[in-house]
Amino acid sequence: MTAKTAVSLRHARVRYGPLEALHGITLTAPGPGLTVLLGRNGSGRTTALRALAGTVPLTDGSVVWDGTDVTRVPAYERARRGLCLVPERQAVFGSLTVRENLELAAPAADLALDAYPQLAPLLPRRAGTLSGGEQRMLALSRALLARARVVLVDEPAQGMSPTVAARTYELLAGLDACVVVAEQRLPPTLHDRTTIVYELRRGSVVFSGEAAELRTGRA
């Protein structure tokens, strides 16, 4: 089992030109375990995920990983240390086959095919020809094979059927890693779990607590 790990944003601010996308937010995602960043488009949820990964710079505040300030550590170095980001778009290599995409993550793809057997007949196809849901399965399979300590995923179940989406969240919740996902709505499979949720609105955190608390507050 992986040792306990955690990633945090502390008083984090991010600007895109004149627009401030994050207004000094603080959040912590412990692991192993699943944390959800919840919010509508423009809420800052994706920006927060990217800030943790190092693909967008902070204008103020810090990113902390296992007690160490990694704010100035570039994204590629965070990846080398065991952080895996699965963005919403361009998460697979479209010109390569499904098999080649998987082999870039690990020589043996058995684990990925166990997780998503739907990919088995697609192995010879180029990833760019897959449907949106199939591409998400492939991208997440690569993340599973990477055996990362921290896994960050933007809208993991986008384009998937309800059954496959539920399976996806079972897989993510079962990883021996710190897993952070960004979603517009809380997935049904997480409603009664002790999953940690941060709800963002216009760049600020408006709720933090367990998923069940969020549902109770809205009942």
PLM segments and residue spans:
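ABC ATPase NBD coupling module
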Residues: 69-89, 124, 214-217
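ABC ATPase C-loop
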Residues: 143-144
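Walker B catalytic motif
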Residues: 155-156
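Conserved beta-strand-loop-alpha-helix hinge in the C-terminal portion
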Residues: 204-219
